[in-house]
């Protein structure tokens, strides 16, 4: 048995301590985990410095921001755990009841998933978010961090397990796979005897590898090739504010806009205003400017590089924006359906017909009208922190909170009935 299999077995053996814990016990564990995380801040920051030093020069500046921890972010992680404790416990919820003509009483009841595996990349906060959500939803959790964030993840998990040790929940219900080699990921993908669910969080390569190779049930958290379409009937003040926020507030996250579509009737006047906002104003403020990848029509109005063959199919996760002009809302929808990832897409318009057409025909997990796509987030949706953004349709779609991490079973109460 490999070390990874041993850790999977430990999580499976410990799952009953979580599956059977009542709400009070789980919340007590979460508060202890949050307190322990804050108490270990110095150790976590020291570990994070190791990760940052190892990554220096090897990852883009925008990705460094995802990896970076500071005292404020650690406090936010701890507060995120406490916020999960404050959420209603979904386990045990009665979803449906019915009584059959033969007198059988059937109850559909929400139950814990069992053991959840998470494979993720360079975001240390995923470690605490995933642990909190899994444990509150009644499941043990096995985490597999990417190499970039491994030292940070190890220090965070050590702190969380210290908190768990003060409660009735077995600390072995939280595992961080120690082997950061590729084989450990494939072992998790094949671990159907240990894992009830596997969730990948990261770039397109990781997600594709898990979806194509896993024999464990998977929820796909797709990449975010996020579009915003500026209609000819858009309010320009709204449009500029929304585009600025969607692209620059945190470009390294999956709900950040990657592609801007602009109606050709307004492109000549709108795009220069956008260029001023995203490029010149940011340079004057000492901020990184947005770099444009332009189709031929957009290039007539603003400066930037010519869009390459793959630029409208790329999740840049950087201060890069692909820009294309379109002749209609129908063309915008066609482009999004051809190039999007069904994550989050939006329209800016004052035309109700255009908005209705867009929301009806765009088949994404979150579809926006006159708002930034950066709101696709469990916390912003009132779900607490999230396990990821599901872009598939089965079981879960959009931000995955506590309910999306549970299953259900039927409890059938009889008085001696037999089937004829």
From Swiss-Prot:
Organism of provenance: Neisseria meningitidis serogroup A / serotype 4A (strain DSM 15465 / Z2491)
Family per similarity comment: Belongs to the gamma-glutamyl phosphate reductase family.
Catalytic function, reaction form: L-glutamate 5-semialdehyde + phosphate + NADP(+) = L-glutamyl 5-phosphate + NADPH + H(+)
Entry-linked SUPFAM superfamilies: ALDH-like
Name of the protein in its database record: Gamma-glutamyl phosphate reductase
Cellular component terms (Gene Ontology): cytoplasm
One GO term (biological process): L-proline biosynthetic process
Record-linked PROSITE patterns: PROA
Lineage: Bacteria, Pseudomonadati, Pseudomonadota, Betaproteobacteria, Neisseriales
Top-level taxon in the UniProt lineage: Bacteria
Pathway listed: Amino-acid biosynthesis; L-proline biosynthesis; L-glutamate 5-semialdehyde from L-glutamate: step 2/2
Role according to the record: Catalyzes the NADPH-dependent reduction of L-glutamate 5-phosphate into L-glutamate 5-semialdehyde and phosphate. The product spontaneously undergoes cyclization to form 1-pyrroline-5-carboxylate.
């Amino acid at each position: 048995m490999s070390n990874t299999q041993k850790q999977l077995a430990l999580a499976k053996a410990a799952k009953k301590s979580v599956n059977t814990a009542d709400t009070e016990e789980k919340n007590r564990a979460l508060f202890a985990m949050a307190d322990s995380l804050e108490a270990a801040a110095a150790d976590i920051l020291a570990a994070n410095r190791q990760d940052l030093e190892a990554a220096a020069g090897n990852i883009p500046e925008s990705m460094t921001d995802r990896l970076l921890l500071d005292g404020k972010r650690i406090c936010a992680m701890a507060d995120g755990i406490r916020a999960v404790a404050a959420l209603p416990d979904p386990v045990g919820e009665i979803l449906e009841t019915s009584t059959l003509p033969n007198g059988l009483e059937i109850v559909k009841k929400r139950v814990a998933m069992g053991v959840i595996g998470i494979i993720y990349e360079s975001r240390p906060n995923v470690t605490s978010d995933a642990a909190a959500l899994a444990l509150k939803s009644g499941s043990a959790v096995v985490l597999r961090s990417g190499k970039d964030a491994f030292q940070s993840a190890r220090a965070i998990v050590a702190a969380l397990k210290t908190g768990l040790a003060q409660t009735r929940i077995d600390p072995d219900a939280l595992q961080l796979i120690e082997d950061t080699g590729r084989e450990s990921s494939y072992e998790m993908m094949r671990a159907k005897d240990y894992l009830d669910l596997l969730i990948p969080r990261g770039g397109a390569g990781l997600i594709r590898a898990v979806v194509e190779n896993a024999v464990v049930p998977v929820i796909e958290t797709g990449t975010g090739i996020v579009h915003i379409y500026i209609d000819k009937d858009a309010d320009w003040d709204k449009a500029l504010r929304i585009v600025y926020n969607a692209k620059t507030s945190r470009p390294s996250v999956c709900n950040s806009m990657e592609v801007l579509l602009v109606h050709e009737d307004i492109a000549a006047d709108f795009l220069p205003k956008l260029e001023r906002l995203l490029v010149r104003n940011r340079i004057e403020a000492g901020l990184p400017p947005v770099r444009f990848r332009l189709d031929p029509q957009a290039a007539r109005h603003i400066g930037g590089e010519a869009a390459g063959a793959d630029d409208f199919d790329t999740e840049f996760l950087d201060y890069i924006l692909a820009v294309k002009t379109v002749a209609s809302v129908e063309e915008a929808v066609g482009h999004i359906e051809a190039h999007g990832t069904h994550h989050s897409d939006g329209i800016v318009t004052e035309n109700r017909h255009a908005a209705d057409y867009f929301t009806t025909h765009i088949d994404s997990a979150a579809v926006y009208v006159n708002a930034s796509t950066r709101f696709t987030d469990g916390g912003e949706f009132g779900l607490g922190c999230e396990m990821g953004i599901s872009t598939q349709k089965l079981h879960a779609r959009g931000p995955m909170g506590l309910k999306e991490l549970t299953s259900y079973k039927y409890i059938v109460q009889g008085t001696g009935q037999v089937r004829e």
